Amino acid sequence: MKVALLGGGVVGSQVASLLQAGTADFAARSGEQLELVGVAVRDTSKDRPGIPAELLTDDAAGLVSRGDLDIVVEVMGGIEPARELILSAIKNGASVVTANKALMATHGAELTEAADHAGVDLFYDAS
């Protein structure tokens, strides 16, 4: 399963570390391999503990537009561009995981409808 991450701050770095460290356990439990294929950040020159530099991109729109993603994890926060990026990921066939309370409170119905229409999942917590 190919995973993209939107946001590489404190939370994003931890999510990236967990995704990379837990691949064997996930594969043993599910029969699927997890592969972190990209992390969208504002500044690719910053050191990001737990995130290999070759995975960093400042082209979030390009990352979520890939047609081969299975899951997009959004940890960037805020309403925009998170909303547009999630809608693009959904349109391109990726399921989405977010803990973005502000986004889900204001656009949860729109995002849920888009995911339902596209036949993908939208998971959220802490919302």
What are these regions (language model features)?
Residues 1-92:
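N-terminal glycine-/serine-/threonine-rich beta1-alpha1-beta2 phosphate-ribose binding loop
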Residues 82-92, 99-127:
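Rossmann-fold NAD(P)-binding glycine/threonine-rich loop
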